[in-house]
Amino acid sequence: MRSVCLSLLLILLPASVLAFEVDHWPDGAFGGQPARLNWQGPVPVPVTRPLTLCALYPHLRDAYWLSVNQGMVEEAKRLGVTLRIHEAGGYGALAEQRQQLQQCVSEGSDAILLGAVSYDGLDEAISASPLPVFGLVNDLPAGLVKAKVGVSWYQMGWQMGQWLAKRHPAGSPPVTVALFPGPQASGGNNFVEPGFADGIEGSAIRLVTTARGDNSREIQRTLVQQTLARHPDLDYLVGGAIAAEVAVNELAQRQRDRPKVLSTYFSHGVQRGLRRGKVLAANSDQMRQQGRLALAQAVCLLQSPEAGEQQCPRVMGPPILTLEAPLANPTDSLSDGTFRPVYRVGVDASGN
């Protein structure tokens, strides 16, 4: 009888409060095998106890962070939360992000959601903040933040490496690959590289070069051009979404179908590339859903600081998808085509 009543309750619940499917790391770090969890999330914030959140992004100049942005905006509106968003201007803007951590305090925020520009360059600034800090997308050292939403970027690299390794196992003809992980020592790149290396270990794949650089189209295009010139017989080019997108364009201009292009993360351009057969495979860490989850996690723990892991998971993220075809429904991964950056939710023109 109890199970029947529960089933009826779930049917009657509006879709907006049904569970998120998440990977959950109860030991507090993005390592090892996560547990799959259906998490209902918090209830909307009562008007008598308003919450103001401050989110800091490395930048908003690519599809990845734009998709995170839309997810956060959607969830802030659903939960009735005031949200202010600041972008640092790039992964080199460490000083700017330190200043923005202080700005969140001066704006009267209740908590900070930090998309960090550095894994370990913000330790002192985070520890000095009087506000609870939540990790957003980019990992931070264990114990430094109250909780975090993201995925294992080691796993992102490993899954792409494994996809290739299964295609070219040991004993098959050798193939070459170039890796374009993005900026040196920033975001998830510290973890993608070793993950990819471990993923291809023991296979017929030989990594001939790793080309690191800022995630701007100009820099990634230059790196791709240099690599194609130095390795004209390259079999695979594996990189972040921007590297994959510019590689597709470069190959089209040169009327070449090699190297084959794979993307370690997702974007609108990568979705188009999969649809047209120009991108062979890609990961999606469902970044729009990460934005929703980050907002929901912060609200959950601000409402219930002593809650257990089942009620408010401290380290979680959406499952990583490895795709060989375009997503039929990309609304958990990509922002809408008409969406533009939003910096304020529930804040009037005067900033209040």
Regions found by a protein language model. Name each.
Residues 111-130, 196, 213-273:
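Hydrophobic alpha-helical
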Residues 14-16:
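N-terminal signal peptide c-region/cleavage motif recognized by signal peptidases
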Residues 148-175, 220-221, 266-270, 285-306:
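Hydrophobic alpha-helical segments within soluble ligand-binding/sensing domains
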Residues 20-49, 289-352:
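Hinge/cleft segment of the Venus flytrap/periplasmic-binding protein
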